[in-house]
Amino acid sequence: MSDQPPPYTPLPLLSSFPPNPYPDQTPDPASTPTLVLPNPAFPNKRKRTGFRRKLPSGSPAAPVAVAASPSAQPPPRASAADDIIVINREPTAEAVTALTAGFPADSLTDEEIEAGVVSDVGGIEQVNYILIRNHLLTRWRETFNSWLAKESFATLIPPHCDHLLNAAYSFLVSHGHINFGVAPAIKERIPKEPTRHNTVIVVGAGLAGLAAARQLVAFGFKVVVLEGRKRCGGRVYTKKMEGGGRSAAGDLGGSVLTGTFGNPLGIVAKQLGLPMHKIRDKCPLYRPDGSPVDPEVDKKVEGTFNKLLDKSSLLRASMGDVAMDVSLGAALETLRQTDGDLSTDQEMNLFNWHLANLEYANAGLLSKLSLAFWDQDDPYDMVGDHCFLPGGNGRLVQSLAENVPIVYERTVHTIRYGGDGVQVVVNGGQVYEGDMALCTVPLGVLKNGGVKFVPELPQRKLDSIKRLGFGLLNKVAMLFPHVFWSTDLDTFGHLTEDPSHRGEFFLFYSYATVAGGPLLMALVAGEAAHNFETTPPTDAVSSVLKILRGIYEPQGIEVPDPLQSVCTRWGTDSFSLGSYSHVAVGASGDDYDILAESVGDGRLFFAGEATTRRYPATMHGAFISGLREAANITLHANARAAKSKVEKGPSTNTQACAALLMDLFRQPDLEFGSFSVIFGGQASDPKSPAILKVELGGPRKKGATEGGKADQHHSNKLLFQQLQSHFNQQQQLYVYTLLSRQQAMELREVRGGDEMRLHYLCEKLGVKLVGRKGLGPGADAVIASIKAERNSSRTKTRPSKLKIGIPKSKS
């Protein structure tokens, strides 16, 4: 089944608008305003000078004209035009704004439908809701430095649509589409103290983690962010370089805002008052000997490259599902041999340069990219200029991290999650407990098993982690005494003769206009990026200087030695293990969705660029995913609170439940050491519920120690020290937990005494021991069912049954 996006069409919503909302004004078809925006179906990855996937373009190809048609008719309903509200005179322009913000201009998103924003999907109510939603989005984009108050729209919205205004406003705020960012008016709304009892642990202080944490703090949650590095930002890292009285700020990771129209990071930059430098289209290429590439040859080869990409699209369409098992590289090589028309060495070198650029755009080898889905996100490219941020993207990171509680140098190695909350274990054994956790670690770390999940993640999520690709891009940043390269361009490229080295310093970024100093960045992509990981920095810098001197010294321009150089090693960075994600052979866009799914009944959530199907491998994708998960966490917290409120009704008698539990444990179904278990459900079902009681303190029971080996394991884990200390106290303490029949049977088989069983229970099974009150309403239902089953069994005559495990002592 093909995963290709449907053909792009003009906004069908316009057919729902009344023919003329202003009957006293007759529109002139010739003067009807037409909005032109780039066709989202055009594959931008093939262009020359972009960051990751989104590349700057001079004039958009295949423009889509969006205009309000004077002959458009309302839905087939009597007096429909009278029912459709009129907010302003430019509904079409506002529909385009919604489109650039990631909304369908004429329909609801799945999230809006799930939120129940309208009672009649597809009716007039939906049309009015969309008009209100689009208007709110447009107003927010115009007034991003102010808090957008719902009350300011009261006079615009008819009273019978107040519920739609409430629904649209609530949805847009809670999902981070409006009233987000770092403007003073937004920050003033953040509560000084938490207003909720829920604690959320955010793992990772990259853009996803910071976006989520900032939203959650604004929503009133208790939040703590755990970051393994000494800095925030993750794969967005602005390095200050200094030497010889010069200084400059260079982005060693994410560096380009890819499309500013609709990009939420563009809004954050505007809130900070930061000017954005549009990356200019000019990108001259130089041959291996340093001479300029013939413009006519350049044009011919670029046309051939684009033609082969078009043919690869036709090829995958004809192959159907088989295309999922074929790489883009294999398809392009086959097509090159049959339709390439590349006859000279210069043409082949140019073609290989374009292949290197494609590998750069996807952070993956072409031999690994899926022919079927490598460009599945192209329809969602952000519209607008591609820009550098003066001073680096670290300025965005620092503003987002302001007043967010971040604990640095805390490397997370275990995340336990269950029905009663989460535990996050960091280096040194320190444990952070919370109600929910958000994991934002890069896909490379997940692939490498850098974080252990207890219980293990669902198999479908593990499979998606394995299928998706995580590639590599490296850079060499060089601060020079002065600018010796052309100042009328932001990029230039260099060709290589060896195809296996085609990505080696193939593209240069000039940061002289935005870094505060003469800074030049050389990019290393594809196979060369992997080889670069083990290249000595001095050798790398020497190779770059050789290229630069080959280009400029024949022009009579001296190339000085750099004052400072930095080589990245993202592939061996333990906190990233790569650069960004791509759709590998065998994977699809569905895998991004699966990675985004929460687990543990709304206890553990996931964010990051590899969890967004629409915007993978981008900075704004990471940021948007953080806003998304802040909304999901809030929804689950609200649902859990509502459920708890219902279940904790006046009929609940805590003392009666406690007494009943004590009575049931007088005849446990299973007993070993200081552990006893009562079972609910059917004995044949290994997943049936059970309640475990652990007796801490008091006299030891038979089986409490085995083989005399328990002492050597005592206190190995900081997590268990407090529990284990109770064994040496005089008073008795009972703690409980819910688990399955199968888990209880596994626990019985653990050797090494009660200490090892405690270790297995908490470390392997990931459960949390609590007092009677901590069991919660779920356990009350199990207790009641066990009592009912036992009462029923007493009415029947049957032989006495032996208990499994160590029998109780006879009196």
Curated annotation (Swiss-Prot):
It comes from the Eukaryota. The keyword Lyase does not apply. Residues 1-10 have a biased composition (Pro residues). Residues 88-189 form the SWIRM domain. Its cofactor is FAD. Residues 1-79, 790-811 are annotated as: Disordered. This is Lysine-specific histone demethylase 1 homolog 3.
